[in-house]
Amino acid sequence: MFKKGFKNIGYFIIVFLVIGLVGCKSHRISEGEKVDIPKFTEVITLKREKDSLGIYNIENGDISKAMETKDMVDVKYNNKNSAYVFINIIEKGKELNKNKITIIKNGKRTILDNFYSASDIDISKEGNKIAYRSFKQDSLQSAEGMKIYDLENKKEIKIKSDVLVSGSLFKWLNEDEILYYGINSEKENKAKIYKYNVKENKEEVYVDNIEGICTYFMPNGDNVLLLSRQGDKFNLSYYNKKDNSFKKISEEVNQIYKGTKSTKNMYFLGKNDLENKDYLYKIDGNTLNLTKLTYDFPPKIDINGGIASDKNGSIYFSGYEDLKEQPLNEIYVYKEKDDTVEIISDKENSYHIMGER
């Protein structure tokens, strides 16, 4: 395990984490009554309430309460296959919060807690597997690496790999294959995006010859949108797997916070290097043209407020209507069909957008 620093607004820090899984039993299964979870819509939001947090469904511009919680900070889910994954805070720490992962699959509860803290959960396309990273202690230096858990069979999946994964740079490509960016220290010193098939226990290079250091990537079908940095230059590019080629999209974006996809296009919250300002961006799925979608409305993007999309091509995100009232934000929606941005929340709160996409 080692770390490599580089600039990210102030400073990026890449921590290369070994893909290694703990061999001992790592979960507890509750065999009690069936756990009922209200069905979530494609897009949901966490909302701060007086003594708790509410999870609210968002659909067609309407916001309605689905359930209440006191300690939940993240949700990943797949309605079709009845898979719901929550991160629950146990207690606050100095550098990290002590937490646990609660899994509800087909009404049965499983707890993962063989770590101090877990984060960056990514759920597979059908909702049967999750990838996440964990920390052994209340310290960012105690990173244990990326882990994969099989929700259906209630067991960790051991990966045979010498690749050191960079932070949270891992994403499911499909139900059985996951992509991750890192270095195989046993063979070379150049980082690449690798693919691992958990069914066949097979690893292979997926994206090679990346220009500089990759700081973000998002699969789009078999292709990959990625942001890289080389010195003081940034490169937003699109990798076409079929012909093994890169197309440069822009050099103006120096950071991507989070992204999502509609059936047509790709979207992300990112920082413009020239203006030092955050925007909601769209990349056209056909032409790969980059477009800013927000200027003065909202006045400021909430880069930590999340982003998600639904089947209608509505892109939900958070922003600040009144800059004096930060950290209270509002919920906005970009409607792909109308090419418009609207505010849909009725008052400011601490919203955090999440969704199936």
What is the role of each PLM region?
Residues 20-23:
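C-terminal motif of bacterial Sec signal peptides marking the signal peptidase cleavage site
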Residues 29-65:
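An edge-strand/N-cap motif at the start of beta-rich repeat modules
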Residues 31-36, 70-84, 115-129, 133, ...:
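Conserved beta-propeller blade repeats
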Residues 42-49, 77-94, 131-140, 179-187, ...:
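Beta-strand C-termini and the immediately following turn/loop, strongest in propeller blades
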Residues 54, 100-102, 145-147, 192-194, ...:
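A short loop-to-beta-strand structural motif that recurs across blades of beta-propeller domains
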Residues 54-138:
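Post-signal peptide N-terminal segment of secreted/secretory-pathway proteins
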Residues 56-74, 103-119, 149-168, 198-213, ...:
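Multi-bladed beta-propeller domains
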Residues 158-275, 279, 287:
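Acidic, serine/threonine- and glycine-rich low-complexity intrinsically disordered segments
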